[in-house]
Amino acid sequence: MWLLSMSDFLRLDHMPSHEELHRKGLLVPRSRTHFCIFISHQWLGPNHPDPKLQQLPVLQNAFRKLISGEIKAMSDLSSQFVGDSCRLSQKECMNLKSGYIWLDWFCIPQKTFELPFEFDGSSDEDMAYMVKVVSLRSPRSRGSPSNQDLFISSIPFFVEVSDMFVALVPRLCHSSTSLQCNFKTYLTRGWCRLEMWCNMLAASSAPFLVVKGNDQVELANLTFLADHPPHEGEFTVESDRRVVYYVMQRALKASLRTLEKQQRWDLFRFTVARYETLLGLPPPKRDFKLFLRDFRFTSLESAKKIPGIGPLECAMLSGQVDMIPFLAGSGFEMSRVIHAKLNMKMMQGKRSPLDLALQLVWRNPDVALELLKFRADANRPNGFGIAPLGYCRTPGAVEMLVQHRADVNKRSGPLFMPPLSICCSSCAPSGVISKLLEHQAQVEFQSKGVGGSQPLACLAVFASSNPHCLDSAKLLLDARSQIDSHYPATGFFKAMEMVARARVLGGSSSSLLKYITEWSTAPLGVACFFGDDEYVDFLLSAGADPDIPNARGHTPFQLANGENVLRVIEEFQEFSI
């Protein structure tokens, strides 16, 4: 595993290839003492990752600012709101300064050649894995791997031993297609998804940073990344889809071995149940005995006491529809509250099997239908007050729940947010938004709790990673959503806003507290605060008023974050003169 020191990386004024860096003696082999930073990025050219030298300075500037303390990397606000409040520690920022970079263009040979040995047909698992990768990447090969094959097949290992994972996703244009590349498009790329999943499956708890600009760095929200299997991504070379399958399979098996050894049973069972979905395989057919063995249950009776991922969740997540009636007849509650210990806090507690089925098993709608047949409650809110409709990922799921008397406008405490707002904030496809509107979901309502809960405002929260954002916004505006509507927080959340104001005035730098003080702003203000320039531009073009103040007297433009948003605002103001 070749690495480039951070000091040498920060001095680069171009993107040298692996061969050039090697020739200059700048690459060093990894040692256990190195603080290794794995860089994942979308290439901006067909034969070169950064032909116009646009990505490189963004990453250099972001690292400089993290090292100096000028910017802080924290969890996104949605994660912070439910208690998943993490930040890059001072020690980790200092480790960056003496760290070492792994980036494909730097550390994988770009000039390929066959290595002087052949596979001997050994049954060894590692050798069999390499044979598969080589045969798919080099179909004309007679069994001799190339130098590049070895490096690509080792990506899970490279991620596993890294101390930090960085997704480099600034908004830039592809040099040959002129199409925009950003976090949304990064999430569609098969190889990027693979690297991302290798990080999530790794035994280490390496921080996952998302770099969107020189001053926009945050810790990734793993909840929304959990439903992006690599094989469903886009590939420039179609045969790479099968290569990724084998690499992902290897990473999954390694993760399961580690989880079983550590006896992290919730995450182990969750991963076993998702195994086929993550690889694009059909649902497994397990008899009762095999079901208990695969999920490591000693008996069905003892499994009833498991508060986390139990038999019902395993059957549901793995798509074993035929097991659900049996479990229902054995006394398992279809609407029970799950308290699981996973590595995604937003998915851990206060959830029901139906919630998870709608969010993660939407590829097999029969699972949710079977839960409903056995009296899963289509209206029962979870601990956050979110009704099952808020987790729908397909129009068919919305229709199914409505047929089971789900209320499309149901709001429950503590959040008091209707399904339409939840779907907008969780990046649901625009078809889901359309179906909710078809069933008379309200686009305007008086807030009962949290500020900024209007659907148009909710779209802004994850606009930078939501490929459906603008299409959904158009649907809402066509349904007569008021582009400048804004309502103050009420009750407990009004008190929370007052406390947040006091904390910010007292010197707190918490981005969550800053948002809470400003959440009475209009959708444009929310978009400016969360820093998505595309959505800001869309709202301005649709006639949003940039001068409407919130409860603190601040206008949307005064809440702007990120250089790209500031650029959009500057262009708008110049055009308006």
Pin down the residues of each PLM region:
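Ankyrin repeat A-helix N-terminal signature
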Residues: 314-320, 345-349, 356-364, 390-396, ...
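The feature represents the membrane-entry module of six-transmembrane cation channels
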Residues: 1-345, 349, 485
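Eukaryote-biased feature marking scaffold/signaling PDZ-domain proteins and nuclear chromatin regulators
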Residues: 31-34, 54, 96-98, 194, ...
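Ankyrin-repeat-protein effector appendages
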Residues: 272, 439, 467-479, 484, ...
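Start-of-repeat signature of ankyrin repeats
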Residues: 308, 341, 349-350, 385, ...
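Ankyrin repeat domain, specifically the short helix-to-loop turn at the C-terminus of the second helix
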Residues: 294-299, 325-334, 338-340, 369-377, ...
